[in-house]
Amino acid sequence: MSLLEQLDKNIAASGGLIVSCQPVPGSPLDKPEIVAAMALAAEQAGAVAVRIEGIDNLRMTRSLVSVPIIGIIKRDLDDSPVRITPFLDDVDALAQAGAAIIAVDGTARQRPVAVEALLARIHHHHLLAMADCSSVDDGLACQRLGADIIGTTMSGYTTPDTPEEPDLPLVKALHDAGCRVIAEGRYNSPALAAEAIRYGAWAVTVGSAITRLEHICGWYNDALKKAAS
């Protein structure tokens, strides 16, 4: 059974939750052993996969969990806005560290390495390639280039203003165009995640609402302050 077939089976049985275990940088939780513990807890709670950033975090997580890991490396580049897995060496390192799926930025922006080359390198390692996209055009272009999975990860993050709500219309448009879609980005409640499935998502990635304690506390603090004013 292929990984995609196994994921199809697990998603049908468990609902399609993927947990992104990426603590706020510099947080007390930003340690490989804590990231791995969060990933294991997510697996035990029914997540069908986890999304992990960084080689040390990935290696530690791989030693604990049995679910597939979506691996990424984030970089801040001087000459490109692309942050997610921008280099071929990043793909190689993620493959060696145990990722089953490698995600790359799939937007049509200036970048050090073409998307096509990154996807080909992932497939060279016999792994699944995921493209983190911001629009229908991005998604369809990446699908034509061979991406196995299209994520809505970058929707709202390539423009000056980021909306509060997730981009459900993008999920539907990509699904209707024949893409295998992972909905990602601002799915901060079970209701929104469920809506993504209704719009055609194959699975839904949730990060901040599960694994970023500072964000969750901020939401509660803001609501309590408003109630008290």
UniProtKB/Swiss-Prot annotation:
This is Putative N-acetylmannosamine-6-phosphate 2-epimerase. Belongs to the NanE family. Keywords: Carbohydrate metabolism, Isomerase. The keyword Isomerase applies. Gene3D superfamilies: Aldolase class I. Coiled coil: none annotated. The keyword Isomerase applies. Converts N-acetylmannosamine-6-phosphate (ManNAc-6-P) to N-acetylglucosamine-6-phosphate (GlcNAc-6-P). GO terms for cellular component: cytosol. GO terms for biological process: carbohydrate metabolic process; N-acetylmannosamine catabolic process; N-acetylneuraminate catabolic process. One of its GO terms (molecular function) is N-acylglucosamine-6-phosphate 2-epimerase activity. Its EC number is 5.1.3.9. CDD domains: NanE (cd04729).
